[in-house]
């Protein structure tokens, strides 16, 4: 029996098993086996040919956004509207066959937008060009999932399932579980909270399935067996996802209202150029970027060339971005903007910068 057949059998077994106290250990074991087989499936085969166009796109700009969706949902049209890149667009499926990068210039930042080929059902098993598409998506800062509004929620659940099966966790945080394999001493299990989904016996069963017999486990929050398996495997990617429903000009106002109220969702129409500005604002929020402007002594601030950093960046991060030796020569900084009580305020390396702050660095 091949890996795909084993995965299919386990999925069927999970689907037909009733979830209750008596079956939780059995389900936990099945989920651990499923995660193991999926990991094996994603390992590149040694006999795989290296022919064909590659998908590797050099990371450029201040952030990377992956555009994922089924064929013919409007990804290429969206890329052409948002950037100066012409991605071939047509009303038939599979127009885009390789990864096409474009750059959005917004609020002084260069955001790399990748138009990935359409994902078909079964992409995680290697159908279509699914594996390469998903591998590129793992390197992004944010996933924009383009969906056809005329098809309701069918596409969304299928795509979520495909990404989930390859270790991409959308709009979730990393489970707060401490896990450390040891050379001896058996399994040490502790928790700082009341656990309602996992027990010590279930944790031991899952660890034994992975041939781990000595480890230290500490649950700092109430997590599910799936979360614990993610911690053991360790190669999961947790990233924000924005669900974008395109073609809203083809559905009723009631349906538009229903889709717009869903969490992490934006409704647009590329054909009529509707709501694209709001989508850009949401994308900026999800990327959590801040623009910092620099100022030389006795001169006006340079508003033409911003330093783009992650939200919560400190003065030290600004120093490293300007020059790697600047932090060691740092004396103090003067900051103008919303992060200070008065302008200018003299601050140290640990001061947290806000969006559109102006900084002047004084060296020793």
UniProtKB/Swiss-Prot annotation:
Arranged from A to Z, the UniProt key words for this protein are: Cytoplasm, GTP-binding, Hydrolase, Hydroxylation, Magnesium, Metal-binding, Nucleotide-binding, Nucleus, Ubl conjugation
Q: Which residues form the OBG-type G domain?
A: 63-288
Stretches of the chain forming a coiled coil according to its record: none
> Is Metal-binding one of the keywords UniProt gives this record?
yes
Subcellular location as annotated: Nucleus; Cytoplasm
Q: What superkingdom heads the lineage?
A: Eukaryota
* Domain annotation TGS: ranges: 288-363
Q: Which residues bind Mg(2+)?
A: 76, 96
Gene Ontology terms for molecular function: GTP binding; GTPase activity; metal ion binding; RNA binding
The Swiss-Prot or TrEMBL record describes its family as follows:
Belongs to the TRAFAC class OBG-HflX-like GTPase superfamily. OBG GTPase family.
Q: Which PANTHER family does this UniProt record tie to the protein?
A: DEVELOPMENTALLY-REGULATED GTP-BINDING PROTEIN 2
User: What name does UniProt use for this protein?
Assistant: Developmentally-regulated GTP-binding protein 2
Q: What species does this protein belong to?
A: Mus musculus (Mouse)
Q: What is the lineage of its organism?
A: Eukaryota, Metazoa, Chordata, Craniata, Vertebrata
């Amino acid at each position: 029996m091949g890996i795909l057949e084993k995965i299919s059998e386990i999925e069927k077994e999970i689907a037909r098993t009733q979830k209750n106290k008596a079956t939780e250990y059995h389900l936990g074991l099945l989920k651990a086996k499923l995660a193991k087989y999926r990991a094996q499936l994603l390992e590149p085969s040694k006999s795989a040919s290296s022919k064909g166009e590659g998908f590797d796109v050099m990371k450029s700009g201040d952030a990377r956004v992956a555009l994922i969706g089924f064929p013919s949902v409007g990804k290429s049209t969206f890329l052409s509207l948002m950037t100066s890149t012409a991605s071939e667009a047509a009303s038939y499926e599979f127009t885009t066959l390789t990864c096409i990068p474009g750059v959005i210039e917004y609020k002084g930042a260069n955001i790399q937008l990748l138009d990935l080929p359409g994902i078909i059902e079964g992409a995680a098993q290697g159908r279509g060009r699914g594996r390469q598409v998903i591998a590129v998506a793992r390197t992004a800062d944010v996933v924009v999932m383009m969906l056809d509004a005329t098809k309701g929620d069918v596409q969304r659940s299928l795509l979520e399932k495909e990404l989930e099966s390859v270790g991409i966790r959308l709009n979730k945080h990393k489970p707060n579980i401490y896990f450390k394999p040891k050379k001896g001493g058996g399994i040490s299990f502790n928790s700082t909270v009341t656990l309602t989904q996992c027990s010590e016996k279930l944790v031991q069963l899952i660890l034994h399935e992975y041939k781990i017999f000595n480890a230290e486990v500490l649950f700092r929050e109430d997590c599910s067996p799936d979360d614990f398996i993610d911690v053991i495997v360790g190669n999961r990617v947790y990233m924000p996802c924005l669900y974008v429903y395109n073609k809203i000009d083809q559905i009723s106002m009631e349906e538009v209202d229903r889709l717009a109220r869903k969490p992490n969702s934006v409704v647009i129409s590329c054909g009529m150029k509707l709501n694209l500005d709001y989508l850009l604002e949401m994308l900026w929020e999800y990327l959590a970027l801040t623009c910092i402007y620099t100022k030389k002594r006795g001169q006006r601030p340079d508003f033409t060339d911003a330093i783009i950093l992650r939200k919560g960046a400190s003065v030290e991060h600004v120093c490293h971005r300007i020059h790697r030796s600047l932090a060691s020569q740092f004396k103090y900084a003067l900051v103008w903007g919303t992060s200070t009580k008065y302008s200018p305020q003299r601050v140290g390396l640990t001061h947290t910068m806000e969006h559109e702050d102006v900084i002047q660095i004084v060296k020793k």
